[in-house]
C-alpha cells in the first residue's frame, strides 16, 4: 500500500517532458517562474500542506497549555470524567496531524525533491545542446555542465524554501500570535522584540551571505572548468610536461574559491553568535514575563507553559530559519550565476515555418555572402560560389583563408551577416537545422569521438543501421582490422570497447578511420572532407582512398586539404586567399595557367602546401 502511494506521488511530474524547452526569461523571479512551468500546481499543493502543518503545530502548544490547566483544576478521578472527550479529540487531532504530515512529506520528497531538479536538468541540457558553436568557444564545457547541475538544485531549493519554510514560518507565527493574545496581549511582546532583532540580523548578514554565495558559485564553476580542461587535454599536458603548471593553474582558481569559503564561514560565525543572543533573550524574556503575569493573576499556569514552550520552539526554529534563509540567499546567488549562462538566447534558430531540407540534386550556391567572426574584421566579403550537382570541389588556401568557414556556414554553424547560402534552391536558414545536417556528411582533421563504445560511435551516423551495415562501414573505412583487438578497463572488447573521452584511447589514425566509417554509414548526399585523411599514414590512406572514391560517387563533395595530391583529382579546384577566390579550374587547367596553384604544386614538400609561397592579391 505504502509503495503504491509513493509511486503515485513520484509519477505526478514528468522528469523528461517532450516539449522543446523555451529559453528562460532574464531576471531572477521571471527566470524561476518560467522554469517551474509544469510543476506550479504541486508547489501550490505543498504550500497548502505547509499552511496546515504550521497551524496544527501552533495548536498543539495551546492544547498542551490547556492540559496543564486541567491538571491543576481537576483530580485524577474527575479529569477523565470532565475532559475525557477533549482528550480523545486531542488524540484524534494528533493522529490526523501525523497523516497530514505524511502526505505533506510525500509531496515534498516524492513529487518535488528528486523529480523537479531532474526535469530542470533535462530542460537545461536540451537548451545547451541548442547553443551555437560560437557559444562553446567562449565557455568551458565543464563550467557549462557545472551550471546545469548546480542551477537545477539551487532553483529547486529556492522554490521549495519559499513554498515550505517561508510559508510555514509565517503561518506558525501568525497562529501563535493569535493564541498568545487570547491569553494576554502582553505575551506577544517578547516575540515582537525577537522578530525585530532577528530581522536586523537577517537584514545585515543574510544579503552578505547571498553575495558571497554568488561569488563562490562563480569561483566553483571556474575551478571546475579549469580542472576539467586539464583532464580533457591530458595528452597535451603530458606532451609538454606541464603537470605542475596545470596544478598551479588549478590552484589559483582553488585559492580564489577558498577566499569565498573563508568569507562565508566568518559570516556564518557572526550569524550563529547573534542568533544565540537573540534566542536566549526570547526564552528568558518570555518566561520572566509569563511568571510576572501569573504572579499578578492575569494568566494561568497553562498560558505560561504555552508561551514558554512556544519560545523554546522558536528558539529551535530560529536556527532552521537562519540557515534556511542563508541557504535561500546562497541558492539565489547560484541561480543568478547560472541564469547568466542558461538564459542566453540561441543565436541560430529555426524559423517558425522552417521545412525539412529535400536534396534532389545536391547543387550548392553561395551568393554575395559577407561574414566575419569579429565585427570590423570581414573574412568573406561578397563571396560567390556555385557548385553543380554531383561536382567534386577542392578548396585550397593557407590557414585563415576561409576554407573551414565556408564549410561551417554551409552547415549553418554560423550565420552570415548578409547574402544567401542554398542547397537545391532552399536557403539553409529556411530549413530545419536537423534536416540540413542530416543531409551532409562531415569528416574533419580534429576528430572527436564520444566516450562510448566503438559501435555507438560508428552507428551515430545512422542510428537505425543494422549490425551488418555498421560492420561493413568499418571494413570500408579500413577500421575492421584493429577494432577486434581493442579493449577497455572494464574488459569490454572489439566493437563494445569504450574509446575514452574524445577517443583518447585510440591513435589519431584509428579515430579518423572510425569517423570515416561513421560518415560512410550515414551516406548523406553531400559530403564535406576537411583534411579527412590527414591523420592516416600513406599505406592506410591509399587503402582507404578507393573506398572514399566509391563513397563520393553521385554526391556533391567539398574537400579541404593542405596535401594537394589528395584533392588533385577533384572536378574543380578553388584557390582562396583572404576570403576571395583567386584561381579555379581542374588540376590540369591550373597547372597550364602557370599561376599560384602551379607555384604551390611546384613548391610542395612531401605533398604538403608550403606556407612560404608568395600569395598574390589578384
Where are these regions (language model features)?
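Membrane-integrated ABC transporters
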Residues: 1-57, 72-90, 104-113, 126, ...
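ABC-type nucleotide-binding domain
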Residues: 357-618
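Transmembrane helices of ABC transporter permease
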Residues: 38, 42-52, 97-98, 161-215, ...
